[in-house]
From Swiss-Prot:
Its EC number is 2.4.1.227. It is found in: Cell inner membrane. This is UDP-N-acetylglucosamine--N-acetylmuramyl-(pentapeptide) pyrophosphoryl-undecaprenol N-acetylglucosamine transferase. PANTHER family: GLYCOSYLTRANSFERASE (PTHR21015:SF22), UDP-N-ACETYLGLUCOSAMINE--N-ACETYLMURAMYL-(PENTAPEPTIDE) PYROPHOSPHORYL-UNDECAPRENOL N-ACETYLGLUCOSAMINE TRANSFERASE 1 (PTHR21015). Cell wall formation. Catalyzes the transfer of a GlcNAc subunit on undecaprenyl-pyrophosphoryl-MurNAc-pentapeptide (lipid intermediate I) to form undecaprenyl-pyrophosphoryl-MurNAc-(pentapeptide)GlcNAc (lipid intermediate II). The keyword Cell wall biogenesis/degradation applies. It catalyses: di-trans,octa-cis-undecaprenyl diphospho-N-acetyl-alpha-D-muramoyl-L-alanyl-D-glutamyl-meso-2,6-diaminopimeloyl-D-alanyl-D-alanine + UDP-N-acetyl-alpha-D-glucosamine = di-trans,octa-cis-undecaprenyl diphospho-[N-acetyl-alpha-D-glucosaminyl-(1->4)]-N-acetyl-alpha-D-muramoyl-L-alanyl-D-glutamyl-meso-2,6-diaminopimeloyl-D-alanyl-D-alanine + UDP + H(+). GO terms for cellular component: plasma membrane. It comes from the Bacteria. GO terms for molecular function: UDP-N-acetyl-D-glucosamine:N-acetylmuramoyl-L-alanyl-D-glutamyl-meso-2,6-diaminopimelyl-D-alanyl-D-alanine-diphosphoundecaprenol 4-beta-N-acetylglucosaminlytransferase activity; undecaprenyldiphospho-muramoylpentapeptide beta-N-acetylglucosaminyltransferase activity. It comes from Nostoc punctiforme (strain ATCC 29133 / PCC 73102).
Length: 357
């Protein structure tokens, strides 16, 4: 009689940065029976493939200070742990994988209280508070950036990189764009991750005329929360809320302007795309600046602080790079050197080693 397939619960919720690496891992474990743990009305309800049944729980993060709201959250956390324990026991799961965030706490506590192994993936250069607290409890902590290990001295750390979506690795990276971009013209791609970046959008629109005059085209992925997304009209400017074929778009790009979330940086690295990075200033513990530092110190990107940034500064930095093709080429090479293209395979192998032994 054949052995029953391994059953794995993946706890990943909230943003593309948490979800895309988890989906990439799941695709590398076709022999596993995988279910998902998420939160109602979050991005996972749209992104997680239907082949992975989605279980949802109510969970919140902790804010500064302690008061009645914290007591309420503690109560909800306790209820979430009980609910995850029920899911794990009823589903006969043999392990848990998580990418952090609010969902990780109840997932790790519930799994470890039942004696189940947990693999935690941390994609950022500065591990989040949840990772720093729960990392030592886990069977292994997989790191996207090697520098993160110094913040997790008591965890069992393994650097595997951060998995990217399959489109970045399966040949789509060289597929043609279905956008009206002439061959040979400089292309600036602006994107703010899965949540967009309204402040960056405004600066780009104010800067773009000089780029058009220099012959560049701009593909601007504005997200879906920018009320002025359609305010700029120009034949060399394409504004879209999102674009599905990001691999081909970044491969074609002469230069990217981006936030520095770990997922976005991983995609830039795999494509070898030089970038100007504008870290999101309100990210938890300013972790996007730590991510950007990895790329800047490697010569793969230029980092500009949003608090000091004006349209004129952004405009001139872009023009300087467009006029320096050798510098752009070197930045692209350095970005590609950071990439771990087989990250999903390495992470899947780690999960197998932890769960099956």
């Amino acid at each position: 009689m054949a052995n029953a397939p391994i059953r794995l619960l993946i706890a990943a919720s909230g943003t593309g940065g948490h979800l895309f690496p988890a989906i990439a891992l799941a695709e590398k474990l076709p022999d596993y029976q995988i279910e998902w743990l998420g939160v109602p009305n979050r991005l996972e309800t749209q992104l997680v493939p239907k082949e992975y049944p989605l279980n949802t729980i109510a969970v919140e993060g902790f804010q500064q200070g302690f008061g009645l709201s914290s007591i309420r959250i503690f109560g909800k956390l306790a209820g979430s742990i009980i609910e995850v324990r029920r899911i794990l026991k009823q589903g006969n799961f043999q392990g848990v994988f998580t990418t952090g965030g609010y969902i990780a706490g109840p997932a790790v506590i519930a799994a470890r209280s039942l004696g189940l192994p947990v693999v935690f993936h941390e994609s950022n250069a500065l591990p989040g508070k949840v990772t720093r607290f729960f990392g030592p409890w886990c069977s292994a902590v997989a790191l996207g950036f090697e520098v993160a290990a110094k913040y997790l001295p008591r965890a069992k750390n393994v650097c595997v990189g951060t998995p990217v979506r399959g489109q970045f690795l399966d040949g789509a990276i060289n597929s043609p764009l279905d956008l009206a971009i002439p061959d040979g013209v400089p292309l600036i791609v602006v994107f703010g991750g899965s949540q967009g970046a309204v402040a960056v959008n405004k600066l780009v629109r104010e800067s773009a005329k000089a780029w058009f005059d220099a012959g560049a085209y701009v593909v601007h992925l504005t997200g879906d929360r920018d009320p002025e997304a359609d305010s700029l009209k120009h034949p060399q400017y394409i504004a879209l809320p999102f674009y599905n074929n990001m691999a081909a778009l970044l491969q074609r790009a002469t230069l990217a302007i981006s936030r520095s979330g770990a997922g976005s940086l991983t995609e830039l690295a795999v494509c070898g795309t030089p970038a100007i990075l504008i870290p999101y200033p309100f990210a938890a513990e300013d972790h996007q600046s730590y991510n950007a530092d990895v790329f800047t110190s490697s010569g793969a990107a230029l980092t500009l602080k949003q608090s000091e940034l004006t349209a004129q500064i952004l405009q001139s930095n872009v023009l300087n790079l467009l006029q320096s093709p050798q510098e752009l080429a070197k930045m692209g090479e350095n970005a590609h050197a950071i990439a771990v293209p087989d990250s999903a395979e390495k992470l899947a192998q780690l999960v197998r080693e932890v769960v099956e032994t």
